[in-house]
C-alpha cells in the first residue's frame, strides 16, 4: 500500500465507553453512530422457523428486543472483560453502523487512564489481526475531552457509565502521578436507583429492567445543591415528585429518589463504598500536583462524560470546590453542553490534525514489534 492511498482514507474515531459506543469519522463535529455497548443473547428457545433469529444481538437491536434477551456489557469499569463480545461490538460498528471496511481506514480508539496494560495490547492485537487495520492509535479519554474544550491546561473530571477519573493536564502534559480513578459512575448510580426504587415497592430485577431504571435516571435525575434541605422539601411537599410511564403503560411516581441517586457521586457511602466523592477526588488530584500549577487547575475544572449530564451538577461542584479550596482561590467549573460526546469530539479533532499523521501505529510496525508497541507509541 503506497503512502498516497493511506492519506486518502478518513480515520475512524471509536470511543468505546462502558455504556455507549460513540463512533464516526475524524473531522466530523459529532459521532455518526451512538449505540449502547450491549450484547444480548436470547433467554428462550426459538420456535418459529425462518424468523432469522440470531444467536446474539448488538446495540440498539439488543435494546429493542431486550424483553427476551439477557443483556451483557462487554466493558466494565472501562476495562474490556469479554473480548469475544467486544469483537462483536466492533464488527457491528464497522460493518453495520459506519458501513466501512476497517482494513482501509486508520482507527483511533480511546481508553480510561490507569487501565491494565494487557487491555491496550489486546485492543491493538484485535485491530491489526482480526480487522486488519492499516494503522491505529489508543488515546486517554480525558485528554481528548480537554482537546474538545479547546484548552491545554485544566483538570478533567470524566465520568461515564463505568469509571470516573480526574486527570490534571498542564500545557498539554498530563501528570500521571496525580491521575485518580474512581470506580463509581453511571452504572453504580443505576444499580443504586434500582435498590432505592425497591424500597418504594417498585421491583426492577432483570437486565432488561435495569435499562428502564437507567432511562428514569437520565430523564428525571438531578443533583441537589443542598442535600439535607432538598430531603426536607421532598418530605414536606410534593413539588419534587414526577411521574414516569413504564413500557407497559403503568405510571409510577418518584420523589426524593430523583436526587438521592446522583447524590451518591458526592457521598459514595450511600453505595457502601469507602471512597472519596467526585469533588474530593478532584481536590485530591489537584493537591497531588505541583504547587505552582494548582491555581490554573482550580480555574479550569472541565466536566465530561454522560454522568456529568445531571442538571445542577455544575453548581454543586462549584459549591463543594469552594468549600475545599483556599478561600482566595478563583474556581471555575466548565460544563460544555456537548460534554456527553466531548471525548469523541476531541478524538475527531486529534485524528484530523496533519501533525498527528506521524503518530499512528502502522501495521508494519506492529508486525515487527508485536502488541507491546502500543506502550511505546501511545501516551
Curated annotation (Swiss-Prot):
Residues 1-2 form a propeptide. It comes from the Eukaryota. Its main location: cytoplasm. It catalyses: ATP + H2O = ADP + phosphate + H(+). Its EC number is 3.6.4.-. CDD domains: ASKHA_NBD_actin. It is found in: Cytoplasm, Cytoskeleton. This is Actin, muscle. The lineage of its organism: Eukaryota, Metazoa, Chordata, Cephalochordata, Leptocardii.
Amino acid at each position: 500500500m503506497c503512502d498516497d492511498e493511506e492519506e486518502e482514507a478518513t480515520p475512524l474515531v471509536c470511543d468505546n465507553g462502558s455504556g455507549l459506543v460513540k463512533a464516526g469519522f475524524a473531522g466530523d463535529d459529532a459521532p455518526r453512530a451512538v449505540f449502547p455497548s450491549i450484547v444480548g443473547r436470547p433467554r428462550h428457545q426459538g420456535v418459529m422457523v425462518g424468523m432469522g433469529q440470531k444467536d446474539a444481538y448488538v446495540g440498539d437491536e439488543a435494546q429493542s428486543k431486550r424483553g427476551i434477551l439477557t443483556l451483557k456489557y462487554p466493558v466494565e469499569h472501562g476495562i474490556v472483560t469479554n473480548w469475544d463480545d467486544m469483537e462483536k461490538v466492533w464488527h457491528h460498528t464497522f460493518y453495520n453502523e459506519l458501513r466501512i471496511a476497517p482494513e482501509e481506514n486508520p482507527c483511533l480508539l480511546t481508553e480510561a487512564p490507569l487501565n491494565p496494560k494487557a487491555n491496550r495490547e489486546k485492543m491493538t492485537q484485535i485491530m491489526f489481526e482480526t480487522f486488519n487495520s492499516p494503522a491505529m492509535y489508543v488515546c486517554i479519554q480525558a485528554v481528548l475531552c480537554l482537546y474538545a474544550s479547546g484548552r491545554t491546561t485544566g483538570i478533567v473530571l470524566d465520568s461515564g457509565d463505568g469509571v470516573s477519573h480526574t486527570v490534571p493536564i498542564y500545557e498539554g502534559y498530563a501528570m500521571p502521578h496525580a491521575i485518580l480513578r474512581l470506580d463509581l459512575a453511571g452504572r453504580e448510580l443505576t444499580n443504586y436507583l434500582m435498590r432505592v426504587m425497591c424500597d418504594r415497592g417498585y421491583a426492577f430485577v432483570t437486565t432488561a429492567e435495569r435499562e428502564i431504571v437507567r432511562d428514569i435516571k437520565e430523564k428525571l435525575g438531578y443533583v441537589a445543591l443542598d442535600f439535607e434541605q432538598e430531603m426536607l422539601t421532598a418530605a414536606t411537599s410534593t413539588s419534587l415528585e414526577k411521574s414516569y410511564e413504564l413500557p407497559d403503560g403503568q405510571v409510577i411516581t418518584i420523589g426524593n429518589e430523583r436526587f438521592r441517586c446522583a447524590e451518591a457521586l458526592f457521598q459514595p457511602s450511600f453505595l457502601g463504598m469507602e471512597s472519596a466523592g467526585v469533588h474530593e477526588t478532584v481536590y485530591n488530584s489537584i493537591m497531588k500536583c505541583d504547587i505552582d500549577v494548582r491555581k490554573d487547575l482550580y480555574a479550569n475544572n472541565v466536566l465530561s462524560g454522560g454522568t456529568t449530564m445531571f442538571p445542577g451538577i455544575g453548581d454543586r461542584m462549584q459549591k463543594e470546590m469552594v468549600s475545599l479550596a483556599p478561600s482566595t482561590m478563583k474556581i471555575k467549573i466548565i460544563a460544555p453542553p456537548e460534554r456527553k460526546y466531548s471525548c469523541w469530539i476531541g478524538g475527531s479533532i486529534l485524528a484530523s490534525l496533519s501533525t498527528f499523521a506521524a503518530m499512528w501505529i502502522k501495521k508494519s510496525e506492529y508486525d515487527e514489534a508485536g502488541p507491546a508497541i502500543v506502550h511505546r507509541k501511545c501516551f
